Amino acid sequence: MTNPLKGQIEVTLGSETYKCRLTIDSLVKIEDELDTGILELAQNIAQAKVRIRTLLVVLRHALRGGGNDFDDKKVGQIISDIGIVVASTEVAKLLVATLNDNDSDEDDKKKALE
């Protein structure tokens, strides 16, 4: 079971469901590896301007953050098995879930009740 309060989410890749987590540290590593800001990366995926290497890097960091032991070869095989379109969709969902600021929504709800 995942813990959304810790930023964990489940991602279904083919017939398997994995725990994933992108921390600030992993987001910085992704930006460094791809030489692209995380928001620009998310926009590019939304506009179908995505490279397979981008999918591989984001998935590798997310899967490792969820406690899975994956290397580029294994992540590449998953992408090959499920297809680029499905992989792009799952990476987009993962980034949206990570970048979405749910805490501010909770603060707004608390203030409205006061």
Where are these regions (language model features)?
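A short, polar/charged loop-to-alpha-helix boundary motif
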Residues: 29-31
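Charged interaction scaffolds used for protein-protein
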Residues: 1-17, 35-50, 67-114
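Short, hydrophobic/amphipathic alpha-helical patches that form generic packing surfaces
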Residues: 56-64, 90-93
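Short linear motifs in exposed loops
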Residues: 21-22
